[in-house]
Amino acid sequence: MGFNINIIGTGGTRPLHNRYLSSVLIEYNGDNFLFDCGEGTQMSLRKQKISWQKIKMICITHLHADHITGLLGIVMLMSQSGETRKDPLIIAGPVGIKNYTKNNIDMLKIYTNYEIIYKEIIIDKTEKIIYEDKTKKIEYTRLKHSIECVGYLFIEKDKPGKFNTEKAEELNIPKGPIRKTLQDGKEILINGKIIKPSEILGKSKKGLKVAYITDTGYFKELIQQIKNFNLVIIESTFKNELKKEADKKLHLTAGGAANIVKQAKVLQTGLIHFSERYTLRKDLENLLKEAKLEYPDGEIFLTKDGMRLEANKNNFIIK
């Protein structure tokens, strides 16, 4: 339970023996949300002892192979774990995600014993919120890549302040569901008097905001979308010396990624989606150095396969 982030993979293009393709799983009070699902994702999930059966929603950024080729394996395994899945699986992504998944399920005769709900995103037309419940919501944001691509914003809703029991007794508010109504942020009527939540509840606690951003070139609109986020996991595909190649392929350098989060005043930044050419630890450390040179006041770190981050007040602690 709680609010945790698991780094499933950190690479780009193809999986390496020590680095799977970029994928992140967010756990929130028993609900699991998987972002991207490249080749080998199920292997990394197994290594980290994370059950694919508990995945509520899979959000795909775009239809390039290194972000989607592991999806069908997860879909298949959910019907082969010895237990029947009770809840539907939600699969979200840009236009084409439904045809890709359904056509392959039919062609490969993949058996599924559960419902799949598709949420195709028509960029700038589809409602920004693609998932929402009482405690959280997920929004998409347009990215700048060679094909239609989106980033995802996982937003924890503000938590109500502490319930003032003494004040409730003073106002003759009976125990039970009516107090819960106030805690849910709704007004109540007692003896002809309207009582607002603000009269009973203390100051609310701001929810945490997490963004998953890959693949994209630099563009100003993104800065506003992730303004003041608690954590942004963002691609850092190339070293600064390869900026021309990054710009051509619509990817980010380490310095480019840091420049975006610096302008957005992001509290914590995790670098991800490392080029396959960077196989040595010192190569990755150089990416980190370049990012920190651009944003020396920011808290920037390298994500690593198997890393786990746990929410702690206004930030996340690496475990």
UniProtKB/Swiss-Prot annotation:
**What's the cofactor?**
Zn(2+)
> What is this protein's record name?
Ribonuclease Z
Superkingdom of this entry's organism? Answer: Bacteria
The upper taxonomy is:
Bacteria, Pseudomonadati, Spirochaetota, Spirochaetia, Spirochaetales
Question: In which residues is Zn(2+) 1 bound?
Answer: H62, H64, H145, D215
Query: What does the UniProt record say this protein does?
Result: Zinc phosphodiesterase, which displays some tRNA 3'-processing endonuclease activity. Probably involved in tRNA maturation, by removing a 3'-trailer from precursor tRNA.
Source species: Borreliella afzelii (strain PKo) (Borrelia afzelii)
List the SMART domains.
Answer: Lactamase_B (SM00849)
Q: Which GO terms describe its molecular function?
A: 3'-tRNA processing endoribonuclease activity; zinc ion binding
Which sites are catalytic? D66 (proton acceptor)
